[in-house]
Amino acid sequence: MEHLLEVKNLSVSIDGPAGEVQAVRDVSFSLKKGEVLAIVGESGCGKSVLCKSIMKLLPPSAKIKEGSICVNGQDITCYREKEMQKLRGRVFSMIFQDPMISLNPTIKIGKQIGEAVVIHNKNYTKEQVNKKVLELMELVGISHPKERYHQYPWQFSGGMRQRCVMAIALAADPDILFADEPTTALDVTIQAQILDLLREIQMKLGTATILVSHDLGVVARVADRVAVMYAGKIVEIGTAEEVYYDPRHPYTWGLMRSLPAFANGKESLYTIPGMPPALIDPPKGDAFACRNEYALNIDYEEMPPMFKITDTHYAATWLLDPRAPQIKSPMGGTAHE
């Protein structure tokens, strides 16, 4: 299947008061039509910067240092703002974390969704715009769209506001939808509804989706593939089944053990010891080594390559090297198995 999106060896840096932060470091992945790829990791690992790099929504202090971004076979790495404006909305669109910040509280919902429709359909009549807005509201599950069309954001619940943001993002039928922590500001019940809606839209429209989250548990119900990020790098990537049921990287083990579902009620919830490294001056070897209870001597000296486990499953850990000792995984089995 042809890839909609291919990112190869992408590195992004951000100039800060203390120096240059290497926010994304040599990241490669691809996305197929209709696929849901979840990118998970701790706050600050580079998930959002990666997505904004692809859409060229980075602040002036950030720059792409190396690598390439191809969409539908076209290299867009060096595209200027005018060229990117033709892609945003139609080729890819984004749902941000906080719907209240994304919406204008002084403008009615129908008009805000309508603005997104008009930007990409300048020849639409008023009637066509209104019809499209109502269709989008129905698509994202907003009941009584004709009445709610005339309401303001403050008259909607948090979950309904997020649905409005989704309607805006879908206004031009994008090929790729970026969902940046879309459930963070919502309670657990509403989180499940929004995730189910994302999956429903993906199946109905064939929209490929990149779902960003810090919670492996959140993405379990919707992802086809999962990429685990740590300190600006993808350290493990595979199908959802492979990453959940056969994780190979010690960081992924830690994330899985941190899920409440793994607690037995008798022990305290597991936490990964230590803190992520400062990316102004990343460590020489494996960035996770100082927090990794299974670290080998080589982890402190040399960055591990991506080791192939299956045709779809890869992990960057020296534990997968044939010369490494057999380490018993806390999830069962060993890193080699």
Predicted regions mapped to residue ranges:
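Conserved ABC transporter NBD signature motif
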Residues: I64-D75
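A short, proline-enriched helix->beta-strand linker immediately N-terminal to the Walker B motif
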Residues: A171-D175
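Conserved ABC ATPase "signature" region
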Residues: Q74-D75, E127-E147, M256
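P-loop NTP-binding/switch modules centered on Walker-like glycine-rich loops
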Residues: K56, F178, P182, L186, ...
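Short catalytic/signature loops enriched in Gly
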Residues: H3, S143-K146, T239-E337
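The feature captures the beta-strand-to-loop junction immediately N-terminal to the Walker
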Residues: V40-G41
